[in-house]
Amino acid sequence: MAERDQLEVDVLFVGAGPASLAGAIRLRQLAEEHKRDVSVMVIEKGGEIGNHGISGAVLDPRAIKELLPDWLERGAPVESPVTSDALWFMSEHGKIKAPIVPPMMNNSGKYVASLQKLAKWMGEQAEAAGADVFASFPGQELLWDDDRVIGVRVGDKGIDHEGKPKSNFEPGPDLLAKIVVLGEGPRGTLAKQAIAKLKLDEGKDPMVYAVGIKEIWQCPPGTVKAGSVIHTLGYPSGGTFGGGFIYGMAGDLLDIGFVVGLDYADPTTDPHYLFQRFKAHPAIAPMLKDAKLLRYGAKAIPEGGLYAMPRPFADGLLITGDSAGFLNGMRLKGVHLAMKSGMLAAETASAALGADAYEENGLALYEENFKRSWAFDELHTARNFHQGFDGGTIACLLYTSDAADDLTR
């Protein structure tokens, strides 16, 4: 059997999403500032950077402006600034448009963006900054020295459906790193290994998840207003946590999706069926008339909030983005928080490299800096959003409106 190669790197980011790519860019910026030779690698399981990002999101630019103040001048691929906001309360046969958009759903100054295009562009920015970015490198398991993470084993190639080597078998390399930063998205393979082994969720609330289902439709020319944003509550989710969204993108593309909390009480609840009913609603169906479905997908969404976030550091390890629960369910946004978490992880890694100290006592700076950041303030404000739905939609809106007032004071 072929030998397994070993590669050494200072900092290894796993998963080429907004968190890891922002972290890689920030770490290379700090290396240049301090005139240090810091090797940074990002690995991604998808065949291309951005493959796992389903198009369509409302991007809060706060974090990316901090990271790259000239991000738009560099050609960041946004579809459109948000041009209109609406909140619809849905019944089975009709809708009521809210007279005002609640503060937490106000998207003035935000951008409708394609996550797929944005991740690809950020990967290019990371490479230009000096990081190595590799697609088709799935992290299979963490490498350990007792309870310290020392690297990642990449998945083997050339194996059959039973996991047995074929004639073209090629063992995945072992990537050894002083610090491993996990940004795999929700319930990431390696993050689950680390959280379970090191009990990083001990003393935390259980993480609660939702499933977000999304489709991209090509609509007839002139029928989609780029930058339009609509969120919905009510039908067809009933008393279940969730709601819909419709984002207008450039080129008459329509991003339509539905979120359903996976803690639903009715065991017969079918999120995909609810999404089909949502699209058939008389307020939604006309938008899809003569349209063609281009892409579809679904992902888990960590909705547990601040008190369900695991401890995001250990010996040789940092956890970022959705893997660590950096998502604001109240605003239905996580990209900016993922970026900020990656930047905070990069700043922690830079300090650790400077001190040649990679144990958890040194990497605890990550959590300390998070608690001093605007990201913590935002997540603290939204800490009970999901639980608020237990009292019904109206009670939750009253809570979130009050919480949003706190955030904007």
Please describe what each predicted stretch is.
Residues 11-36:
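N-terminal Rossmann-like FAD-binding beta1-loop-alpha1 element of flavoenzymes
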Residues 30-52:
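Glycine-rich FAD pyrophosphate-binding loop
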Residues 46-92:
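N-terminal FAD cofactor-binding segment of flavoenzymes
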Residues 105-124, 265-269:
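Short beta-strand to alpha-helix junction loop
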Residues 128-283:
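Predominantly flavin-linked oxidoreductase catalytic cores and closely associated redox partners
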Residues 300-320, 325:
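FAD-binding beta-loop-beta segment adjacent to the flavin cofactor pocket
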Residues 347-391:
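Active-site-proximal substrate-binding core of FAD-dependent oxidoreductases
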Residues 399-408:
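Single conserved hydrophobic/aromatic residue that forms the stacking wall/gate
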